[in-house]
Amino acid sequence: MTDPRRTEQVHPDYADLDTLAPDALIAALADDQLGAVRAVQAAAPQLTAALNAAVPQLERGGRLVYVGAGTSGRLGVLDATELTPTFSWPPERAVPLIAGGERAIRQAVEGAEDDEAAGERDVQAVNIGPDDVLIAVAASGTTPYVLGAARSGRAAGALTVGLANNPGAPLLAAVDCPVLLDTGPEIISGSTRLKAGTAQKIALNTLSSALMVRLGKLYGNLMVDVRATNAKLEDRARRLVQHATGADADAAQAALSECGGSVKTALVMLKLGLGAQEAAQRLEGAGGHARQVLGEGEALGTSAS
């Protein structure tokens, strides 16, 4: 009997996959990944709805809580972890939960994803509340751990977003903002770390990056909230200030040194001729939106979904 979940079905076009020459094998595997991009493009309206719903939550100080199992859980951990160095997002406001706990990041924890009660407990343990945004990810959309977590988060009043790769998946009915990433059968049957996982990664990148844009973490397309924690990023910070202000390298570095390395504060200092303290205070008063401080336009509000 055929599994009704499309991600578990046998792809009809690749029955001879194990007989392909090396170049054809690589081409087939790479080409099939393009379906992930198409799936995310098709889900753009749903991602926009999730974005518009989540921004007010986060503006009130809410957290991003990611939930998943296996590949989906690891992708959530990755997205949560990268928000701090990229956007200076407070690490305590990005909470990744994975079935089986931290050990599951590096190795499979058999049976962990089947424990619905564990998902409920893990969400309750982080004291999820009405200002939080829970992003639940499961290729099948049927994973008990993820369903338990999503239902628990929703019951606690959190905004819930669900990413699943199967039409009609229970996860999509269990959340406030369902996002269907319809990637279909995998080139290696059932291996959802491939196309389904790629679509999840793109969708998470898209949603979290869009959230950071709307929360004032960028100026234009510049990462002005980047945390310079190594030599490469320190050099990038200086170049960002130069690009945004037209200042020379010495002036950019001096401003960064005065304000503790904040690119956003440095560009406001140089553009408005302010000291570090005054620039920082103005940014705080504008909710971190540099354009508003600079008088270059109001911070964008949410658009219609």
Swiss-Prot record:
GO aspect biological process, one term: peptidoglycan turnover
Active-site residues, as the UniProt record annotates them: 82 (proton donor), 113
InterPro entries associated with the record: Etherase_MurQ (IPR005488), Glucokinase_regulatory_CS (IPR005486), MURQ/GCKR (IPR040190), SIS_dom (IPR001347), SIS_dom_sf (IPR046348)
PANTHER family for this protein: GLUCOKINASE REGULATORY PROTEIN
Source species taxonomy: Bacteria, Thermotogati, Deinococcota, Deinococci, Deinococcales
All copies of domain SIS, residue ranges: 54-217
Keywords: Carbohydrate metabolism, Lyase
Pathway assigned in UniProt: Amino-sugar metabolism; N-acetylmuramate degradation
Gene3D superfamilies: 1.10.8.1080, Glucose-6-phosphate isomerase like protein, domain 1
UniProt GO MF annotations: carbohydrate derivative binding; carbon-oxygen lyase activity; ether hydrolase activity
PROSITE patterns linked to this entry: GCKR, SIS
One Pfam family from the record: GKRP_SIS_N
Function noted in UniProt: Specifically catalyzes the cleavage of the D-lactyl ether substituent of MurNAc 6-phosphate, producing GlcNAc 6-phosphate and D-lactate.
Catalytic activity: N-acetyl-D-muramate 6-phosphate + H2O = N-acetyl-D-glucosamine 6-phosphate + (R)-lactate
Family to which the UniProt record says this protein belongs: Belongs to the GCKR-like family. MurNAc-6-P etherase subfamily.
Assembly behavior: Homodimer.
Name the record gives this protein: N-acetylmuramic acid 6-phosphate etherase
EC number: 4.2.1.126
Extra information: A lyase-type mechanism (elimination/hydration) is suggested for the cleavage of the lactyl ether bond of MurNAc 6-phosphate, with the formation of an alpha,beta-unsaturated aldehyde intermediate with (E)-stereochemistry, followed by the syn addition of water to give product.
